Amino acid sequence: MQRIALYPGSFDPVTNGHLDVVRQAVHLCDKLIVAVGVHHGKKPLFSTEERLAMAHEVFGPVASAAGCAFDASTYDNLTVTAAQQAGAILMIRGLRDGTDLDYEMQLAGMNQTMAPSIQTVFVPASVPVRPITASLVRQIAAMGGEISHFVPPSVVAPLKAKFA
């Protein structure tokens, strides 16, 4: 049986924190699906297509190097439903700190009730990327700050262009 894992998020933009989670997750599964959430009530900085392209460009080579199949797709329903539809048995969630853990434990409990066959796997962020959040990265970029420490090289120019 193929171990399929779903890693959901907005990825607006892809950050080094996301990359850190993917680097760990590809060793836990045979196929990793990065699921880009589409929330109709929110206006992301990057379009859905741009976020999917970033995911493929940044995460695809990492998965390939680890011998893990990779795909990126979108979803606009419950994350647990997206995981079921993808055939996932694992849901990957990154943790930066205790606040994340408290929130993620609630989600994991609700998801387990709705889909007992899907196990949530918490991946702790490596120390250098723990403070990174996509919202802080967007704020820094909007104010002309240096973002290259927080996002993969291929994301720097597109992110700066959004605020040019």
From Swiss-Prot:
Annotated GO CC locations: cytoplasm
Residue numbers binding ATP: 10-11, 18, 94-96, 104, 129-135
The keyword Nucleotidyltransferase belongs to this UniProt entry's keyword annotation: yes
Entry EC no(s): 2.7.7.3
Pfam families (alphabetical): CTP_transf_like
Keywords carried by this UniProt record: ATP-binding, Coenzyme A biosynthesis, Cytoplasm, Magnesium, Nucleotide-binding, Nucleotidyltransferase, Transferase
Residues reported in the UniProt entry to bind substrate: 10, 42, 79, 93
Domain of life of the organism encoding this protein: Bacteria
Predominant localisation class: cytoplasm
GO molecular function: ATP binding; pantetheine-phosphate adenylyltransferase activity
Pathway involvement of the protein, from the record: Cofactor biosynthesis; coenzyme A biosynthesis; CoA from (R)-pantothenate: step 4/5
Reaction(s) this enzyme catalyzes, per UniProt: (R)-4'-phosphopantetheine + ATP + H(+) = 3'-dephospho-CoA + diphosphate
NCBIfam families registered for this protein in UniProt: coaD_prev_kdtB, cyt_tran_rel
Record text on subunit structure and interactions: Homohexamer.
Main function: Reversibly transfers an adenylyl group from ATP to 4'-phosphopantetheine, yielding dephospho-CoA (dPCoA) and pyrophosphate.
Name of the protein in question: Phosphopantetheine adenylyltransferase
Naturally occurring in which organism (per UniProt): Bradyrhizobium sp. (strain ORS 278)
Gene of this entry: coaD
